[in-house]
């Protein structure tokens, strides 16, 4: 009888082509997502060596990082470097026979929102993209992670990837979440617990009652930020919620093929007694709404907390780092999080730019008005999310409250397009990274859930969403 295996073990074994004595493996790749930033050199490498894309039907190209989200984006991209990258992707996709969603295609959006929407992402698959937040697709029980540009070229040419197997890590979130505490709070709490290096060298499987209770979109939020916890990939075993989400998606299996697929997907569960190299357990009932205070995703605290004092940290290197973070963020130890005022609010990104996120925001802001001191924007994660939100009338609620309702794209998650912070501006953001300069030169980013961001936009400062009227 074979040894019990984890979900990661099973997907790995199903895709292992070859293994060398030193542990170097060749892994088959089922799906390859491509965007404009990390692919130009990869396609050029194919061109220079006379190679083709081995499996264009398993490759999907989407523009997201550089595209403007302003209503006039049909007039073109002003920044020359951004325009060149977008044009290169269109040219490369056409030349190499890869399906491509341009900025004028309603299926366009952030690549990690588009993949699941289209049924391109399926359980048990290996999925890669030249983007660190590829871990998002792990919500479907797929082994998904980011790769570098040279690896993008390798996958395009061979549909395989060379790598060594990671260790297994389990993060279990037991119990039920309190009202108004979300998937975003779960993953921020996990990163706060394990640190940004806590998952290094591991693939994390998320499990427990609180994880199972999440919708597919909530699970995508959790898996999206696995990389911020240091792990290469995050996984959640598929279940009936997964199967229901997939049914009817454009690229998903249909009819008998779907039934056969579901029969296989049901085997994608960790066996009883399987070994994890590390186990972390959190109590869902104890989790509050969370806000980041520093310049790392591990710098998190309850919205009811105060900015911590780095002098309380024994390790000198870490202590120095946290003082630097406070200096950058313009904060002093002991400041109440609810006393921190804001200049900007950004709701969107591959972490929280889906329809359920926007519905939560609408509940918070309906009938209210954005604070006069705040500039707030909502960026749907894809053209289909935008279409759905407008069909439900959410855009009218947002506009009436004073939010800027934008076109789909990565937007202010990162300073690679026109949406960015000015030096010194403080932003409540539903994105995934609060590094120095991430949203703009000397911009100050606080990571929060969509509902928390929405409430902060109305109040002009952080508020506890549990006390929101």
From Swiss-Prot:
Entry superkingdom: Bacteria
Cofactor(s) the record lists: [4Fe-4S] cluster
The entry's keywords: 4Fe-4S, Amino-acid biosynthesis, Branched-chain amino acid biosynthesis, Iron, Iron-sulfur, Leucine biosynthesis, Lyase, Metal-binding
Cysteines joined through disulfide linkages: none
Record pathway: Amino-acid biosynthesis; L-leucine biosynthesis; L-leucine from 3-methyl-2-oxobutanoate: step 2/4
PANTHER family linked to this entry: 3-ISOPROPYLMALATE DEHYDRATASE (PTHR43822:SF9), HOMOACONITASE, MITOCHONDRIAL-RELATED (PTHR43822)
Function: Catalyzes the isomerization between 2-isopropylmalate and 3-isopropylmalate, via the formation of 2-isopropylmaleate.
Protein name as annotated: 3-isopropylmalate dehydratase large subunit
Gene: leuC
